[in-house]
Amino acid sequence: MTAPAGPRGSETERLLTPNPGYGTQAGPSPAPPTPPEEEDLRRRLKYFFMSPCDKFRAKGRKPCKLMLQVVKILVVTVQLILFGLSNQLAVTFREENTIAFRHLFLLGYSDGADDTFAAYTREQLYQAIFHAVDQYLALPDVSLGRYAYVRGGGDPWTNGSGLALCQRYYHRGHVDPANDTFDIDPMVVTDCIQVDPPERPPPPPSDDLTLLESSSSYKNLTLKFHKLVNVTIHFRLKTINLQSLINNEIPDCYTFSVLITFDNKAHSGRIPISLETQAHIQECKHPSVFQHGDNSFRLLFDVVVILTCSLSFLLCARSLLRGFLLQNEFVGFMWRQRGRVISLWERLEFVNGWYILLVTSDVLTISGTIMKIGIEAKNLASYDVCSILLGTSTLLVWVGVIRYLTFFHNYNILIATLRVALPSVMRFCCCVAVIYLGYCFCGWIVLGPYHVKFRSLSMVSECLFSLINGDDMFVTFAAMQAQQGRSSLVWLFSQLYLYSFISLFIYMVLSLFIALITGAYDTIKHPGGAGAEESELQAYIAQCQDSPTSGKFRRGSGSACSLLCCCGRDPSEEHSLLVN
C-alpha cells in the first residue's frame, strides 16, 4: 500500500529521508505500532530512570553500586589521609632545608626578607658572594644538618667540580650618563669559576691559610659592573630525610640543587639576592633500619583500593553503555513508529553525569594509587602529581554522594537550584567577565608601576576579586594614597577606578548574581513554576502507570544474575538495565 498523499505524508517523508536511522530502516515501517512493544519500552525507560530504592522495590535487586560507593568513600579517604601525612613530611623537609640554606649561604638574611633582600654597594656584593662560597666549603662544620657534597654529576655548569661561580655580562658595554651615550652589544657572555670542596673535613676556621689553591681561586673574582647582567652560584648537596620513620617508611635520599642569583639586569643600583632549590628524591643505597616494621599492610590496602575502584569503574561504565543502547533503541522506535526525530537534549537525558563523574574519579584514584605504590617503593618521586590525582579523585568521590541525596526531596534543594540557575548564571558570568577583564587590563597598565597589587595580570585579578568580597579594601586605598606625591594624576585616576569598580561589582553585579540564585530557588519551590516543566521524554515515560511494587518489573527476576552480567535471562528482558 502506498503512503497517503498530502502535507502529512510529505512531512513524514521529509523527516525520515535525511538520515537512514539509528540502526533502523530508512523508510517508515508499514506495520502499525504494537501496544505491548511500546508498553514494554516505557516500562524499561521508567526502570532506567528509577532511584536505587525504587529499583530494589521493582526487581528486588540490591543497589550494588550504592553499597560499593560507600565502601569506596571509606577506603579512598583513609588512603588519602595516610598519603597526606607522608606527603606533608616530605614537603616540610624540603621547605625547612630551603630556609636553612638561605640562612647559611645568604649574608645577613632574615626570615620574610625575600622581596627586600639585596646588595647596594660593590663591597656588599663581593661580601655576599664570598660568604656563600666560604659557607659552602665549611658546610660540614657550620651546618646543623647532615649534608654531603656532590662533585660534578653531569651538570654542564659545574664542569666536574662541586660549585660553579658564574657571571654573565654583555659582550661589549659602554655607558656614559654624563654625555647621555651608550654602546651595548646585547650578546651575553658567561664566565665561570669552578670551586672544589675539600676532600676531607676542613681545619678549624682560625687557620685561614690552609685552603687549597683550587678552592681559594674564587677570591680573584673581578666583576664587570658596567655591563654585568647577573652572578650565579650553582651547587648540589645530598641529605637524608629521617622524618619518614615516623610513618614506618624507609627514609628518602634527597639531592638539593641550589641556585643563588645576584640579579643586575635592571642596572638600577639595587641587586636583589635570591636562593632557590630543587629537590630530587632517589632510593637510598643499602637502607638498614633496626626493627623496621613490615610495610606489606600498606601495600595490601593500596591493592584493595585499586580493586574497589576498578569494580566501580566497570559497573559505572556498564551503566553508561546500557544507557547509550537504550537511547538508540528509544530513538529508533520513535523514528520507526511515529516518524519523530528525538532532539539532542532529550538524548542527553540518557547520559548520567554522575556516572561520568564516578568513572573519572575511579581513573584518577587508580592512577594515583599506582603512583603512590611507586613512591613508597622508592621508584618514583612525584609527590605533587600523586597528591593532585588522589586529592581530586577524593573530591569527586565525595561530590558523587550528592547524587544519592537527590533521591530525597528535602535534600535535593542544592542540586535542583543549581540545575535551574546554571544556564542563567553562565550567561550572566560571560557578560560580567568582559567588564572584569577590562578592569584588569586597565589597572595593570595604569596602576602597575605605582601599586604592588597591580604588578601583574594575575595579581590584579586576585586584588579585584578580593575587593568584590570586601577584603583588603582599606589596605588597597592606603597603598595608593602613599603614591599621591609621585603622580597626582595617577592617584586621581586610581580613586575613580577603585570606586567605580567597587560600586559596580558589589552593589550591582553581586546583587544580581544573588538574585539569579534566589529566583531559581523560588522557582523550584512552586510546583507551577518553570522548574517543574517536564521534557517530552519524561512525559512519555509518565504514561507508564506501573508502580515499582506492581510486580510487572520482575519478569525473569529468578534467573541467575552475577555482579557484572546476567546469564540465562528471559529473552523479553534482554534489554533490561540493572542500573543501581
Curated annotation (Swiss-Prot):
Region (Interaction with phosphoinositides): 42-62
Gene Ontology cellular component annotations, sorted alphabetically: cell projection; endosome membrane; Golgi apparatus; intracellular membrane-bounded organelle; late endosome; late endosome membrane; lysosomal membrane; lysosome
Effect on the protein of changing V446L: In ML4; does not affect channel activity; affects channel inhibition by low pH; impairs Fe(2+) permeability
Residues with attached carbohydrate: N230
Positions of modified residues (Phosphoserine): S10, S557, S559
Bilayer-crossing regions: 66-86, 299-321, 351-371, 383-405, 428-448, 492-513
GO biological process: adaptive immune response; autophagosome maturation; calcium ion export; calcium ion transmembrane transport; cellular response to calcium ion; cellular response to pH; iron ion transmembrane transport; monoatomic cation transport
Motif Selectivity filter, chain ranges: 469-474
Span list, region Extracellular/lumenal pore loop: 107-121
Catalytic reaction list: Ca(2+)(in) = Ca(2+)(out); Fe(2+)(in) = Fe(2+)(out); Mg(2+)(in) = Mg(2+)(out); K(+)(in) = K(+)(out)
Mutation effect (V331L): In a breast cancer sample; somatic mutation
Written domain comment of the UniProt record: The most N-terminal extracellular/lumenal domain (referred to as I-II linker or polycystin-mucolipin domain) contributes to a structure with a four-fold rotational symmetry in a tetrameric assembly; the structure contains a central highly electronegative pore with a 14 A diameter. The pore is critical for Ca(2+) and pH regulation. The protruding structure formed by the I-II linkers may contain all the interaction sites with lipids and proteins in the endolysosomal lumen.
Family of the protein in this entry: Belongs to the transient receptor (TC 1.A.4) family. Polycystin subfamily. MCOLN1 sub-subfamily.
UniProt protein name: Mucolipin-1
